[in-house]
């Protein structure tokens, strides 16, 4: 289980999908991408989906996602995404009253019970008191993280100029 904090965008894409029975159908699916802007989010989802789509791909919606963090699972059969709303409990030192602040997370898991277990595993390592006040399965198909392309390829004898033999 690993977690990642970033700027996330929810995107909706429409494309022609080949169904299990071999028929073609136009589907609309939701994905989350890691990006810095709406333009970058659109570019990222087109790049990611172009591998899976043969025909026309239309980005029908982009919106900024409110996820504080996303928990990625390393287990192969964890194929669903759950939206978890947690409330962190703190005590206000001045008024000595309990304060609650809400944060939304996205959790990759096979089932609701496993998603709750993953939340407890990650949050159990912290010193923060919390309550899980909401945990719902989403219609998200996948989450795509930003990958920085390698701009400079390592050369065999990559030596700084001042060390070069002349």
Residue map of PLM features:
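Short, low-order "capping/linker" segments at domain edges
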Residues: 74, 144-156
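Extended, compositionally biased
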Residues: 56-83, 91
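Short, well-structured hydrophobic secondary-structure segments
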Residues: 34-66
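Short, structured motif recognition centered on aromatic/hydrophobic residues
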Residues: 7-13, 31-32, 41, 45, ...
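Short acidic DE-rich linear segments
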Residues: 153-166
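Short aromatic-glycine-(Arg/Gly/Cys) micro-motifs in beta-strand/loop hairpins
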Residues: 2-26, 76-100
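A cross-kingdom feature marking solvent-exposed beta-strand/loop segments within repeated
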Residues: 17-34, 51-54, 92, 97-105, ...
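Mixed-charge, glycine-accented linear interaction segment located at domain edges/termini
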Residues: 104-144
């Amino acid at each position: 289980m690993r977690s990642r904090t970033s700027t996330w965008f929810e995107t909706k894409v429409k494309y022609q999908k080949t169904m299990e029975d071999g028929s073609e159908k136009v589907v609309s699916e939701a994905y989350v991408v890691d990006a810095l802007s709406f333009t970058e989010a659109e570019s990222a989802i087109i790049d990611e989906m172009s591998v899976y789509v043969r025909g026309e791909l239309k980005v029908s919606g982009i919106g900024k996602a409110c996820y504080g963090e996303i928990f990625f699972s390393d287990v192969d059969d964890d194929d669903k995404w759950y939206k978890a709303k947690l409330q962190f409990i703190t005590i206000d030192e001045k008024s000595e009253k309990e304060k609650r602040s809400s944060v939304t997370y996205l959790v990759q898991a096979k089932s609701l019970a496993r998603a709750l277990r993953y939340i407890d595993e990650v949050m159990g390592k912290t010193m923060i008191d919390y309550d899980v006040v909401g945990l719902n399965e989403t219609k998200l198909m996948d989450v795509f993280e930003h990958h920085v392309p390698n701009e400079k390829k390592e050369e065999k004898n990559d030596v700084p100029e001042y060390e070069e033999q002349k």
